[in-house]
């Protein structure tokens, strides 16, 4: 069968994109091919479940724009679909004087990004919001929430199927070839022909882009993040999201406290190099993935720049007492005995060959293909807005309005 559009990747971004395209173009022959046995298994399935406000991102960036738009769209969607979420809020807490300039800059960034209801709290205000948290100054964001993104992704998939789209799982794409103005999408389940292709491959995004002659940069370097979980009898220590003041030189937000929809409280994550793109444990090693990372010039330069930080993260990864000590900056009464081993996730960190880490969403392509090259956090929060952004791009590149009109006539 020939499809109008084949989407490679059945995570939350690929599903949101398929949903948006079918809404705009009823009757569009659309296929989503997902390599795993279930949809949204990788980054979406290991997501911490935070609905981000948009405070962290550079004003004018795609992350800032799409996160704010996507959060509001997500609320509306979940209300309409009766998907539960909670706006539990977030504290971004400074515990030392040296963090105050970055905290103040973050507040101004939030104002510039149009985040509603931001408050500056002193130590007493922090204690009022989070009685067990200690800090000297904090930002409170009332529009930060929590949700189960697996439920959201499955709902998007239901929408795709209801509008006539096709979804294939256990379908690993192995190549994409251009033939006669169309694309042949090869997989372990056979080949299909598509007029246009959109890749939303997450941890495999660079490899998918290179299948169609895309640039080698940005390269995906996988970083694993391990969580601890508060024991049920200690959940009273945390009411909402508690985050540190991020280091602007480092792309990760630092260890934090995250309530979950099921009542759990996650602590973390750390950030250590994963030895496989889907390596959710220290012992999972994929030789191809590891060799690609260790020989990539960008990673070599990054490792030299952040050697001490990386060693500290690795030490905390194998020493729970050190891990908990980093959390005690915010909740001093927390102890190792209050924690259980939690899940892990892998972040697809896009990197350039000069060692710089890509800090914004990145999309590229040509007349027949659109690639999502970098869509880390807050992609889940932003998913509906990202879907609209990609659909806009596809409409321009693929002239879908004319194609749809021709199909109808």
What are the residue ranges of the model-derived segments?
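C-terminal catalytic lobe of FAD-dependent flavoproteins
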Residues: 297-405
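Beta1/beta-strand and adjacent pyrophosphate-binding region of the FAD-binding site
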Residues: 1-13, 31
């Amino acid at each position: 069968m020939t499809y109008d559009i084949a989407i490679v990747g059945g995570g939350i971004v690929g599903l949101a994109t398929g949903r948006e395209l079918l809404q705009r173009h009823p009757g569009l022959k659309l296929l989503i091919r997902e390599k795993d046995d279930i949809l949204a298994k990788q980054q979406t399935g290991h997501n911490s479940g935070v609905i981000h406000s948009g405070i962290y991102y550079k004003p004018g960036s795609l992350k800032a724009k799409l996160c704010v738009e996507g959060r509001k769209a997500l609320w509306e969607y979940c209300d309409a679909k009766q998907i539960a979420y909670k706006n539990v809020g977030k504290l971004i807490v400074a515990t030392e004087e040296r963090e105050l300039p970055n905290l103040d800059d973050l507040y101004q960034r939030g104002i510039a990004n149009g985040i509603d209801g931001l408050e500056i709290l002193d130590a007493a205000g922090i204690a009022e919001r989070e009685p067990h948290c200690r800090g000297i100054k904090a930002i409170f964001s009332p529009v930060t929430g929590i949700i189960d993104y697996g439920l959201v992704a499955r709902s998007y998939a239901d929408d795709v199927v209801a509008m006539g789209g096709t979804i294939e799982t256990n379908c690993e794409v192995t190549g994409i070839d251009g033939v006669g103005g169309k694309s042949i999408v090869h997989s372990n389940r056979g080949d299909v022909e598509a007029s246009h292709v959109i890749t939303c491959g997450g941890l495999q995004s660079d490899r998918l882009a290179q299948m169609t002659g895309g640039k080698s940069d940005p390269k995906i370097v996988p970083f694993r993040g391990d969580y601890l979980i508060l024991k049920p009898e200690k959940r009273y220590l945390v009411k909402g999201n508690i985050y540190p003041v991020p280091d602007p030189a480092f792309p990760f937000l630092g260890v934090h406290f995250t309530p979950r929809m099921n009542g759990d409280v996650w602590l973390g994550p750390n950030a250590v190099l994963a030895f496989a793109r889907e390596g959710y444990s220290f012992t999972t090693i994929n030789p191809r993935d590891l060799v690609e990372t260790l020989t990539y010039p960008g990673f070599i330069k990054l490792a030299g720049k952040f050697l001490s930080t990386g060693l500290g993260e690795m030490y905390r990864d194998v020493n729970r007492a050190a891990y908990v000590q980093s959390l005690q900056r915010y909740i001093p009464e927390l102890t190792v005995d209050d924690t259980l081993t939690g899940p892990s996730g892998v972040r697809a960190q896009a990197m350039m060959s000069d060692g710089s880490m890509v800090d914004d969403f990145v999309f590229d392509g040509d007349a027949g293909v659109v690639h999502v090259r970098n869509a880390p956090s807050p992609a889940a929060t932003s998913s509906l807005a990202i879907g609209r952004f990609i659909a806009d791009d596809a409409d321009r590149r693929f002239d879908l309005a004319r194609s749809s009109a021709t199909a109808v006539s």
